[in-house]
Curated annotation (Swiss-Prot):
The active site is at C221, H300, H384, H388, H417, N421. The keyword Phosphoprotein does not apply. It comes from Arabidopsis thaliana (Mouse-ear cress). The keyword Nucleotide-binding does not apply. This is 3-ketoacyl-CoA synthase 16. Expressed in siliques. The gene is KCS16. It is found in: Membrane. Belongs to the thiolase-like superfamily. Chalcone/stilbene synthases family. It catalyses: a very-long-chain acyl-CoA + malonyl-CoA + H(+) = a very-long-chain 3-oxoacyl-CoA + CO2 + CoA. Its EC number is 2.3.1.199. It comes from the Eukaryota.
């Protein structure tokens, strides 16, 4: 777009954004002019009219009070994000690509991992080198020992350390008592022991016995937004309460020890991580809350077999359990994302972008079928983007298809580099990065978007209620000076 046309578009967007003010301005001027012409006699006549029509006046105020009451009772209750906390694993669990591959070779030499050829080792190493992950991501202790420890007890220890650590830090930062929590929602896709993870938190923090608790399983990397949406729904029913949302994934029990290439990819991408989020519907909490939840949009295309089967946990030909990623995954993800954007767009985009979309649609429909679809400028709707750090290719495609800048996807790339794919909690590490960089100001709008098995694409939209500073023990506070880093890898090699 050349410079003159760009200026025209900016001016048009400004007109559309302030259309109501511009429309009402002439009306207000006319009212002011007419009011200035009123005489003292006109005002006295109006006063006498009110004195002689008590019944009409009473009915007017009665209807006004009734309407106001009904509006206040039926309108959606605001949901505030008081604070959130991301888990930072201990430093001894850091594992570079070299350390990981050395350990894999030792495991293989010990006979615990019977890979058929060196080709699979080279495949894993290439995935690690090109994934966008850095050299300080965290691998569970049970996977850094010889022999590997993948039993239920060790897996439970990993998850307990993550969720308890995140929640404990959240309680310390907010000063909230565990007994104040009325709603608890926990999500973990592939690790769901009995008692549940939500029960672990109830027991550890002695949460009250009438708490409304949910434990979401098997819902993939997009489950963090699903958990937020579930908590939002419960907060519409239960007044003056707090909701605690916890998102995590277990790595220990999900290491794949077979020879299927489509199942080895997840070994290379997923790392330890988890987040705890405190929500509130109490009006008094607005003053100290960081954000207000504006929208949640959920899309599930599982009715289509290709969507349903593109990411599944299953046994390979040798009976070894892993998560298989099909070749249809990019196509399915693009289709599901498109539906989510089509649903979210009308809710958040300014009318100018809706107008451009409509014009392009008419041209394509009636004049030129080969014309490309109009891609809305989502930077007019959001200041910050938290795109699920599922992998470098995913972030690249989102940047390209949504016409984003490197700065727009910086939080996602740096989260992938520093922490790896932490599944449903990655969008919270990204938000923590934005806060740590001091970029979050009052009124800023944030788009969190995550994709996961099923196949699902879910979005949440927040607005900052103040200039947000990073909370104590922000996961980036010890390494922020290193970021952003330059990531230059040729994926075509």
């Amino acid at each position: 777009m050349d410079y003159p046309m760009k200026k025209v578009k900016i001016f048009f967007n400004y007109l559309m954004a302030h259309r109501f003010k511009l429309c009402f301005l002439p009306l207000m001027v006319a009212i002011a002019v007419e009011a200035s012409r009123l005489s003292t006699q006109d005002l006295q006549n109006f006063y006498l009219y009110l004195q002689n029509n008590h019944t009409s006046l009473t009915m007017f105020f009665l209807y006004l009070a009734l309407g106001s009451t009904l509006y206040l009772m039926t309108r959606p209750k605001p949901v505030y994000l008081v604070d959130f906390s991301c888990y930072l694993p201990p430093s001894h669990l850091k594992a570079s690509t070299q350390r990981i591959m050395q350990h894999v070779r030792l495991v293989r030499e010990a006979g615990a991992w019977k890979q058929e050829s060196d080709y699979l080792m080279d495949f894993c190493e290439k995935i690690l080198e090109r994934s966008g992950l850095g050299q300080e991501t965290y691998v569970p202790e049970g996977l850094q020992t010889l022999p590997l420890q993948q039993n239920l007890a060790v897996s439970r220890i990993e998850t307990e350390e993550v969720i308890i650590g995140a929640v404990d830090n959240l309680f310390r930062n907010t000063g909230i008592s565990p007994s104040d929590i009325g709603i608890l929602v926990v999500n973990s896709s592939t690790f769901n022991p009995t008692p549940s993870l939500s029960s672990i938190l109830v027991n550890k923090f002695k949460l009250r016995d009438n708490i409304k608790s949910l434990n979401l399983g098997g819902m993939g990397c997009s489950a963090g937004v699903i958990a937020i949406d579930a908590a939002k729904s419960l907060l519409q029913v239960h007044r003056n309460t707090y909701a605690l949302v916890v998102s995590t994934e277990n790595i220990t029990q999900n290491l794949y020890m077979g020879n299927n290439k489509s199942m080895l990819v997840t070994n290379c991408l997923f790392r330890i991580g988890g987040a705890a989020i405190l929500l509130s519907n109490r009006s008094i909490d607005r003053k100290r809350a960081k954000y207000e939840l504006v929208h949640t949009v959920r899309v599930h295309t599982g009715a289509d077999d290709r969507s349903y089967e593109c990411a599944t946990q299953e046994e390979d030909e040798d009976g070894i359990v892993g998560v298989s990623l099909s070749k249809n995954l990019p196509m399915v993800a693009a289709r599901t994302l498109k539906i989510n954007i089509a649903t979210l767009g009308p809710l958040v985009l300014p009318i100018s972008e809706k107008f451009h979309f409509f014009v392009r649609f008419v041209k394509k429909k009636f004049l030129n079928p080969k014309l490309k679809h109009y891609i809305p400028d989502f930077k007019l709707a959001f200041e910050h983007f938290c795109i699920h750090a599922g992998g470098r290719a995913l972030i690249d495609e989102m940047e390209k298809n949504l016409h984003l800048t490197p700065l727009d996807v910086e939080a996602s790339r740096m989260t992938l580099h520093r922490f790896g794919n932490t599944s449903s909690s990655s969008i919270w590490y990204e938000l923590a990065y934005t806060e740590a960089k001091g970029r979050m100001t009052k009124g800023d709008r944030i788009w969190q978007i995550a994709l996961g098995s099923g196949f699902k694409c879910n979005s949440s939209v927040w607005v900052a209620l103040r200039n947000v500073k990073p909370s104590t023990n922000n996961p980036w506070e010890q390494c922020l000076h290193k970021y952003p880093v330059e990531i230059d890898i040729d994926l075509k090699e």
